Curated annotation (Swiss-Prot):
Localisation per UniProt entry: Cytoplasm
Protein known as: Fumarate hydratase class II
GO biological process: fumarate metabolic process; malate metabolic process; tricarboxylic acid cycle
Family: Belongs to the class-II fumarase/aspartase family. Fumarase subfamily.
Top class in the EC scheme: lyase
Keyword Lyase: yes
Length: 462
């Protein structure tokens, strides 16, 4: 491998000749050989959006030449397009402010910008700190990139995935609205409802968590840029934060604003905790939905078997003919990961000592992992399971007819204690509910048939 010599305030260091990064990135690469978790490319691209916006703002403020600004913008656009992904090698486990990743972006943009200028015959030189990082600090750029990346992940991936599954469940609510099944509480038989009603509960969960996520996401549209080192805005123009936020809004199509209090923006990540909490609420609901699906599909002969799920692959390497609820299992594992990520984010966000939180990279990594896992898992569950759910009406009807909990309909007519005696007698003697009721002498067959009708038990009545 061929190398070139780069220099920084610590001296000289060898850098691979074919890479666009420079000394500080190389030092980080050598000093932090920890794990395999690379800084998410979403953060890199959010940084590129920020650097592009900063260059244009500094140009408008008369602090950066048009020639340099144009080269920085072109280089940043290439990063956003994914052209230089392999030039961002740093892991998450670095300085807690994300300084090395900020400098990685600065160095790549500077070196690529200089290539662009050289191709045009210019002898102007772009400096990673003086030009690309002008009016900025890692302390305000990383939280800005964090918020931009998280907002885009939620609005471009998570929310559309929820909408997709919501639409599928809405179709199932209508398709199954006529199928009366036995309800279950505490994993025990309860009073009847329709399969459509049961699934409508799942649909409502997604409606609510979708709104929670969208609402919480608005708080992350406040950006730290303009706060520089400790929130005072030293070395930045007073209008810089607002101007950059406007540029970012224009490029992303999302309405970002300059955070009104930069001291808060640098040291606290409560907005990320709040939004990830909404993602955790979604995850909790998805766990419930996935579990209901796999339990309702259990069997086929020794389980509940009330719904049929698609057979996507052989279920067992030793037992032929099994159809396992693999999509539910994958989704519930994602939920477990999201729950763990939430604990990490909550603790990391509590570590804002004095003017700066120094757990930023791990917050970014875990939030973006949660967002993308949830989005991917929801789409997979929808496409490979939910759309293909069918009802086994024969088993559902059999379970309703066998249930002793239909006795609940007798409560207003013969009282709770008498109804309980009938249910216990039927269970003990192996009788149907009707047989036990008639033996009690409290009801005629005509009265029983009129009262104990599952169709009359699925909604309130006057």
């Amino acid at each position: 491998m061929e190398y070139r010599i780069e220099r920084d305030t610590l001296g000289e260091i060898k850098v691979p000749a074919d890479k666009l990064w420079a000394a500080q990135t190389q030092r980080s690469k050598e000093n932090f050989p920890i794990g395999t978790e690379q800084m998410p490319l979403e953060i890199v691209k959010a940084f590129a959006i920020l650097k592009k916006s900063a260059a244009l703002s500094n140009q408008k403020l008369g602090k950066l030449s048009e020639e340099k600004a144009e080269a920085i913008v072109v280089a940043a656009d290439e990063i956003i397009a994914g052209k230089w992904n392999e030039h961002f090698p740093l892991v998450v486990w670095q300085t807690g402010s994300g300084t090395q990743s900020n400098m990685n972006v600065n160095e790549v943009i500077a070196n690529r910008g200089n290539q662009i200028l050289k191709e045009k015959g210019s002898d102007v030189h772009i400096h990673p700190n003086d030009d690309v990082n002008m009016s900025q600090s890692s302390n305000d750029t990383f939280p800005t990139a964090l918020h931009v990346a998280c907002v885009l992940a939620v609005e471009n991936h998570v929310l559309p995935a929820i909408t997709k599954l919501k639409e599928t469940l809405a179709e199932k609510v209508t398709a199954f609205e006529h199928i009366i099944k036995i309800g279950r509480t505490h994993l025990q038989d309860a009073t009847p409802l329709t399969l459509g009603q049961e699934i409508s509960g799942w649909h409502r969960m997604l409606e609510k968590t979708e709104r929670m996520i969208a609402e919480s996401n608005t708080y992350m549209k406040e950006l730290a840029i303009g706060g520089t080192a400790v929130g005072t805005g030293i070395n930045a123009h007073p209008k810089f934060g607002e101007m950059v936020s406007e540029e970012i809004s224009q490029f992303t199509g999302k309405q970002f604003i300059s955070a009104p209090n930069k001291f808060h923006a640098l040291t606290s990540h409560d907005e990320v905790v709040y939004t990830h909490g909404a993602l955790k609420a979604l995850a909790a609901d998805l766990m419930k939905i996935a579990n209901d699906v796999r339990w309702l599909a259990s069997g086929p002969r020794s389980g509940l078997g009330e719904i049929i799920i698609p057979a996507n692959e052989p279920g067992s390497s030793i037992m032929p003919g099994k159809v396992n609820p693999t999509q539910s299992e994958a989704l519930t594992m994602v939920v477990a990961q999201v729950m763990g990520n939430d604990a990490t984010i909550g603790f990391a966000a509590s570590q804002g000592n004095f003017e700066l939180n120094v757990f930023k990279p791990v917050i970014a990594y875990n939030f973006l992992q949660s967002a993308h896992l949830l989005a991917d898992a929801i789409v997979s569950f929808n496409d490979n399971c939910a759309v293909g759910i069918e009802a086994d009406e024969e088993i559902i009807k059999e379970n309703v007819n066998r249930s002793l909990m239909l006795v609940t309909a007798l409560n207003p007519h013969i009282g709770y204690e008498n109804a309980a005696k009938i249910a216990k007698h039927a269970h003990k003697e192996g009788l149907t509910l009707k047989e036990a009721a008639l033996q009690s002498g409290l009801l005629t067959e005509e009265q029983f048939n009129e009262i104990v009708d599952p169709k009359k038990m699925i909604a309130p009545k006057e």
